[in-house]
A protein has these predicted regions:
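Short, glycine/small-hydrophobic-rich surface segments
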Residues: 48-71
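Solvent-exposed loop and beta-edge segments used for protein-protein assembly and interaction
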Residues: 61-63, 78, 167-171
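Short, surface-exposed polybasic-and-hydrophobic patches located at secondary-structure transitions
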Residues: 152-177
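Type IV pilin-like appendage domain
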Residues: 64-154
């Protein structure tokens, strides 16, 4: 009887250890996901903070699928500027939040090329092998709102808005994931 009780206790002990190991692994995966999302949001903030208005170019555009922006290339901007695009697209059969950035440029022609590349990349729904694409995290859906003239609104909405206001940079950008 004692041997049977000890065998039962040993079996239960191993089950407890296996359950604890599973819990540790689940917590580790969750922590990794949270850290990835935190780093992604930090990059989002850095991109918005580094936006730069260049003559005869667009600084920010939301087309309903991707957010495109022009930003300084480095912390000082002496290396020129880059175009960054953020979008949600299917990669490997799962929707992902993605970021893409152009090579640095210093001319309007370079900006136009980078802007067109960003638009082409964002419209591509199949898996991309572009080295400038970074897959950030799984994302079911996302929404972007601009804060202009004292209210949050859809960036694509132009109802009752002054065209000069719609073409200016918003006072704030809200991201809903």
């Amino acid at each position: 009887v004692a041997l049977a009780i000890m065998a039962l206790m040993a079996t239960l002990g191993w089950r407890v250890l296996a359950s604890m190991q599973t819990a540790v692994e689940i917590n580790r995966q969750h922590a990794d996901q949270v850290l990835t999302l935190d780093a992604s949001l930090a990059q989002w903030g850095m991109d918005l903070d580094a936006m730069v208005e260049l003559p005869l170019t667009r600084t920010l555009e939301w087309d309903g699928r991707a957010l495109h922006l022009t930003r300084r290339s480095g912390s000082t901007g002496s290396d020129g500027a880059i175009v960054v695009a953020w979008t949600r697209a299917s990669r490997n059969g799962q929707f992902q939040w993605l970021r893409w950035q152009s090579l640095p440029f210093t001319s309007r022609e370079g900006w136009q090329t980078a802007w067109n590349e960003a638009h082409n990349w964002a419209q591509t729904s199949q898996d991309s092998t572009d080295r400038r694409e970074v897959r950030l995290t799984g994302l079911a859906e996302w929404q972007v709102f601009f804060y202009r003239t004292g209210a949050w609104g859809n960036p694509l909405s132009s109802t009752g808005a002054d065209p000069a206001v719609n073409n200016s940079l918003p006072d704030g950008i809200r991201l809903v994931l």
